[in-house]
Each structure stands twice: as C-alpha cells, then as structure tokens.
Amino acid sequence: MESESESGAAADTPPLETLSFHGDEEIIEVVELDPGPPDPDDLAQEMEDVDFEEEEEEEEGNEEGWVLEPQEGVVGSMEGPDDSEVTFALHSASVFCVSLDPKTNTLAVTGGEDDKAFVWRLSDGELLFECAGHKDSVTCAGFSHDSTLVATGDMSGLLKVWQVDTKEEVWSFEAGDLEWMEWHPRAPVLLAGTADGNTWMWKVPNGDCKTFQGPNCPATCGRVLPDGKRAVVGYEDGTIRIWDLKQGSPIHVLKGTEGHQGPLTCVATNQDGSLILTGSVDCQAQLVSATTGKVVGVFRPETVASQPNVGEGEESESNSVESLGFCSVMPLAAVGYLDGTLAIYDLSTQTLRHQCQHQSGIVQLLWEAGTAVVYTCSLDGIVRLWDARTGRLLTDYRGHTAEILDFALSKDASLVVTTSGDHKAKVFCVQRPDR
C-alpha cells in the first residue's frame, strides 16, 4: 500500500531581522520587519526585502505509506540482513551526500560520484526529478529553509539551484573548487566555502553576491550561527574565523596557538549560538565562545585506540576529528574520531563522560532533538544509536554493503536516511522506545 505524507508547518516564531544585499556595494543591513507574514513576491524582488521569518503553516506527519514491492530504481531486498524500508538505487557510483527537506521531511536530495543529484520521495523512493548538468562529483546538496529550493554543488565549484515545485533550474554559479555549502537558516541565501579560501554568499535566485576573503588556503568547513547574522568558518591552516554577515568582516580570528594545529574538518554550534565546537586533523576538538572568540575548552580522547579499518591509504597515525555536535537537552557534546572512538564530553566539567568504540572509523554523528541519543554512521556500513547518559549502545541498523558516507535524521527521529559507497541511499524506520 502506498500513501504520501502531507506537508505542514512549524510553530509560530517571532519576527526576525533581515539580511540584505545591495548590488555590488557588498553591504548588508539589518532591517526591522513589520508584524505579520511576509509577501512571497517581495522576496523575489528587492534585496532589502529578503525575509528571514520562518513559514507559518501547520505540519502533519504520516506514519505509514511504505512501499514493499520494488519499483524502478528501488531495491526491495538484497542479500544479507537489510533493516531498511526503502532503497534508492538510481546512482551508478558512490553516493556522497544526502539532505531532507526541512519543512515536511518527505523529500530527500542525494548527490554522488556519478556527477548526478536526484530529488526523490522518502515513502517509496519515487524519483521526482534529476538535478542535471553537473560535470564532477556532487558532494553537497540541501534544501532551503522553507523547502522551496534545492541546491547542489560539485567538486569543481559548479552550484545549481532548482525550484522544487516546478522542477526548474533557477540559478547557477561557478566558484572555485567546492569545500562546503549551506543554506541560511531563515532566508533564500546560499553560502559556500572554496579551495581559494573564500566564503561566498548569494541571494537566490537574484544571484547578488558577497565574498568573505580568508587566508590563502581552503575554507574547509563552515556553519551559519542560529542568529543568522554570523558565520563560523574553518580553514586548512587551522585558523577559525567568525564573520559578521552585515559588515562583511571577521569579528574574531583564532590562529596560531589559539587555533588548531592542522586543517579544520568540521564545525557545530549549540542551539542559541553561544558556543562553537570545531574539529581538526590534529585530533582535537575546541570549544569556543562565540561572544568573546576565546577557546574555553579543548577535548582530546584520553586513549587512542588502534585503528581498525580506517580505510586503504589512510595513515594509521592520523586520528582526525570527523564529526561533532551538541546535545539539545543536556550539557553534553559528542565527538567522532577516525579511529572509531565516539567521545561524550560533559561541558559543565569539561571532562570525558563516555568513550564508545566502533570497529571502524566514524564518518558522521547527529544528535536526536529533545533527547540524549546520538546517532553515528561509520565505515563498516552500520548506523548506531547511543544513549549519551550511559554510553550504552541502544540499537543498530544494517543494510549497506559498503561504507556509509553521509546520513540525515528526520525532525521527529522516525527516519534515518543514509548514503553509501555501494551506490545506494537507504531509508530506515527508527523504533523509538521510551528514552
């Protein structure tokens, strides 16, 4: 039986300030918004009318609708244990990235080594449209804050944006070699970091652009802070910069002994944006105050386990931080390392609380909203759920025949969507016992 999830909306949020572009002047100004919902037509006209308010519509989930019979591009079963509900199999090479539409969590976009990106439906794996035109591996993909736009970026620096409802391309740009890409949390504004050290910011689909020039080395990771006014960017030389998106200048710069001693690999912020966590190939995670720009804590695993299955060609002595994040309900942070260590740190005491070992390197971790459960995916192709309070493994999900390269978690934590070197993306239905 097949059914489709109906769209819905987030709860009311107070009016927010506006980020604006002014042509070639590279000036961003903050404008107070009048109460009431914005006119969508205004967003597509003047740059000063960019709206940061979240859409206010009702959202309704769908708890059924899984299709068990194979369709074109959907694998219903495979040899060995497979806990997944749906497998998307239209990619012909490794699938590098996945993102879910934030408004309804009913659509996914995936990008791969086959130079292709697809937008498809989670409930049955049905292809909605292909994001065509890339000429290199698609390593970044994501939906805008209101799920109306989807962006894809390839390694060569070609970025494209499509209107989801019309399935039409509305914008494209060729930057330098792409390192990361992220939508602004409240506006149709796209940010990206490139190998030349620049961080780019575009109004979509107008295309008005602003650049933030970093050191003469790749901008390896970045994240817009929750207030939408600042962004933190990490660089290959170990430098961390917190940028003011209004002024176009760095508020804080951490470098030398203040920064990392190796390239930045990942960055995360807590819910209110007061704290930033950065990870590096130097095996350290640094806790930084977003207000003062000072390092307030440094985390490193107490013991470094032997590194089983870190991958062919990897240097065994390297134990980089691969992923990290903050718990939303407790003062905890999780750090995942290449050697397979998941470290849970207590932020209030800045001590290691639990150390959970995987059999192979961790690729990514995500916290479940509203709980102390952290999800990990690793090079052994398994998704694991951990209770950060006890360090206990709750359950795992299997089905891939190669390493997992990325994963996404639905807002209600009912679905996990993974991508893998086995050329497939999978949807897992998560059982949620009382936490």
Swiss-Prot record:
Q: Which residues carry this modification: Phosphoserine?
A: S20
Keyword DNA-binding found: no
- Give one GO molecular function term: heparin binding
Q: What InterPro entries does this protein's entry cite?
A: WD40/YVTN_repeat-like_dom_sf, WD40_repeat_CS, WD40_repeat_dom_sf, WD40_rpt, WD_repeat_multifunction
Arranged from A to Z, the UniProt key words for this protein are: Angiogenesis, Cell membrane, Cytoplasm, Developmental protein, Differentiation, Membrane, Phosphoprotein, Repeat, WD repeat
Does the entry feature the keyword Phosphoprotein, yes or no? yes
Spell out the subcellular localization from the entry.
Cell membrane; Cytoplasm
| Region feature Disordered, mapped onto this chain | 1-65
One GO term describing the cellular component: microtubule cytoskeleton
* Ranges of the WD repeats in the UniProt entry: 90-130, 133-172, 174-213, 215-255, 259-300, 316-355, 357-396, 399-434
Q: What is its main location?
A: membrane
One GO term under biological process is:
positive regulation of endothelial cell migration
Q: Where is the composition biased (Acidic residues)?
A: 39-63
Described purpose of this protein according to its UniProt entry: Plays a role in angiogenesis and cell migration. In smooth muscle cell migration, may act through the RhoA pathway.
Know the name of this protein?
Answer: Angio-associated migratory cell protein
* Taxonomic placement: Eukaryota, Metazoa, Chordata, Craniata, Vertebrata
